[in-house]
Amino acid sequence: MSEIPAELKYTKTHEWVRQAGQGDLTVGITDQAQEMLGDIVYIELPEVGTTVRASVECMVIESVKAASDVYAPVEGEIIEVNTSLTDQPELINQKSYDDGWLFRLRPNNTADLDRLLDAKGYADMIAAEG
């Protein structure tokens, strides 16, 4: 069973969101997503300063199995990317909720977080997917 930390919010496309200081958000892919992808070998991070729209792809992760888009959970501006992943994309497989985070963004409207799933909602969605 995949790890689903209770303190995070989730998207239907398997991204997780952690609220950081000053209302900023840290974003990554869930344990479930990295398990489905398999060994991650390459990532294409978004550029700092880029404005992203909710539910629109903003970066790509490539694994030995497939390439997968990553979607922005809310609208906002990319303020930081995890450059460690450029040389160590396997951190996403090893520590998807910690060192494997993808980017940080400053949301345009923090109320957008209310439409994301909580841990139970995400677990129920995974169970329904089979």
From Swiss-Prot:
PANTHER family for the chain:
GLYCINE CLEAVAGE SYSTEM H PROTEIN, GLYCINE CLEAVAGE SYSTEM H PROTEIN-RELATED
Per the record, the domain of life is Bacteria
Q: How is the cofactor bound?
A: Binds 1 lipoyl cofactor covalently.
Function text: The glycine cleavage system catalyzes the degradation of glycine. The H protein shuttles the methylamine group of glycine from the P protein to the T protein.
For the modification N6-lipoyllysine, the affected residues are K65
According to the entry, what is the taxonomic lineage of the organism? Bacteria, Pseudomonadati, Pseudomonadota, Gammaproteobacteria, Chromatiales
Q: What is this protein called?
A: Glycine cleavage system H protein
> Which Pfam families does the UniProt record give?
GCV_H
Designated gene of the protein: gcvH
User: Could you tell me the Gene Ontology terms of the biological process aspect for this record?
Assistant: glycine decarboxylation via glycine cleavage system
* Any GO CC annotation of this UniProt entry: cytosol
Q: Which cofactor does it need?
A: (R)-lipoate
Q: Which species is listed as the source?
A: Nitrosococcus oceani (strain ATCC 19707 / BCRC 17464 / JCM 30415 / NCIMB 11848 / C-107)
Q: Which UniProt keywords apply?
A: Lipoyl
How does this protein assemble?
The glycine cleavage system is composed of four proteins: P, T, L and H.
Enumerate the transmembrane spans.
Answer: none
Boundaries of every Lipoyl-binding domain copy: 24-106
What family does the entry list?
Belongs to the GcvH family.
